Amino acid sequence: LIKEYRLIGFDNRRDAVADSTIDLEGGELGSGNSVLAYFEIVPGSDQLFKDTGPSGEKLATIDLRYSLCNDTAHLRFSWDCPANFTDFKSIDKELQFATAVAMFGLKVKQSKYIRNAEWIDIHNIAQASYDPNVFLQAEFLQLVDKAEAIYSRKKKKKSKSDD
């Protein structure tokens, strides 16, 4: 089902992510908090995203190793990701907003993995999904606009110097 995959944000640990036998060290996560991991996948065929219903096939298996606070014993949790697809506009607004944040990080880094996305795409996703009651989300929208102005100026200066 999957031809290639990449854990976004772990470009410096690409070999470790590619080897499914290696445990990746993570940071500490306090009680009541959560973490979100983004994987970019290259499907083995276009059919993967056309079938939106449950198929019985699994897309991936996520293995999580963790320990409880003040405990040295490691516990494991394994979860099979079903091979079903949900249109982006149908997922939770929080996940849509988190996607805009991830795209922003890739764009600022000038990652080769986000060359087809423009600042307006990031802004539109964030604008459509942010909660106006959450100050940090509103501030993020301003940050996207500021970054666009700065990075667009850099691009224009570079273009003029290339002439």
Where are these regions (language model features)?
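Conserved functional hotspot residues or short segments at active or partner-binding sites
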Residues: 42-156, 160
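Acidic, polar loop-rich interaction surfaces within structured domains
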Residues: 1-69
